[in-house]
């Protein structure tokens, strides 16, 4: 991998596919992403095709994946809205939700069996903000600092996305504090009250 971070896999070493997920989510391992792509689809190109199919399925309309790791390519792009949709979808998977909430993971290698490596989560928001439940950092020279995160308070889960933001930790905290303060539920008990509420990314365009 020409640029970026790694979980530092070596030729001949063996780990579980779930360990590659840990390497990606904790250490931002580009090598882990590429290894997973080869294992699942046979090549990064074919895996990226599957990524695009899933993106379309969940309503990501301004995204095109070219590299499994997220490293720069002229045709590799997304938007804050699409990343929020992806994070919301991913959090529905219990394995992902549990993994992204961890501050560190220790990987026990299959080969060599004696090797164990601890990987710390790059997402500092887990330590800086008590309501943070997970997220993913990202950085390249072209994209700058990018952060997708989630937080839960009083039964309400929110997702926040910033792109090319040098002050991402503080900005996410400020945005969450504002959103949680302003959010309120409405108990509709009046049988005469009825309205169509528009939805984004759902099975229907609106609910009544």
Stretch-by-stretch model annotation:
Residues 1-81, 90-93:
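Active-site-adjacent loops and short helices of periplasmic peptidoglycan-processing enzymes
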Residues 60-61, 72-77, 81-208:
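Domain-terminus/edge residues, biased toward the C-terminal soluble/receptor-binding domains
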């Amino acid at each position: 991998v020409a640029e970026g971070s790694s979980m530092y896999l070596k030729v001949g070493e063996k780990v579980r596919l779930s360990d590659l997920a840990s390497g990606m989510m904790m250490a931002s391992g580009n090598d882990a992403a590429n290894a997973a792509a080869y294992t699942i689809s046979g090549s990064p190109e074919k895996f990226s095709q599957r990524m695009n199919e899933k993106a379309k399925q969940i309503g990501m309309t301004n995204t095109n994946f070219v590299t499994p790791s997220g490293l720069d390519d002229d045709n590799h792009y997304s938007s804050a809205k699409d990343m929020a949709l992806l994070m919301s979808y991913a959090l529905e998977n219990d394995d992902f939700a549990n993994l992204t909430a961890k501050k560190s993971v220790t990987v026990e290698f299959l080969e060599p069996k004696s090797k164990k490596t601890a990987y710390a989560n790059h997402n500092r928001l887990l330590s800086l903000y008590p309501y943070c439940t997970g997220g993913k950092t990202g950085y390249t020279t072209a994209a700058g600092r990018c952060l997708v995160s989630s937080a839960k308070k009083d039964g309400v889960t929110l997702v926040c996305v910033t792109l090319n933001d040098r002050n991402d930790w503080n900005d996410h905290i400020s945005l969450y504090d504002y959103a949680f303060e302003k959010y309120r539920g409405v108990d509709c008990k009046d049988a005469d009250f009825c309205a169509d509420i528009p939805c984004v990314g759902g099975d229907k365009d609106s609910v009544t």
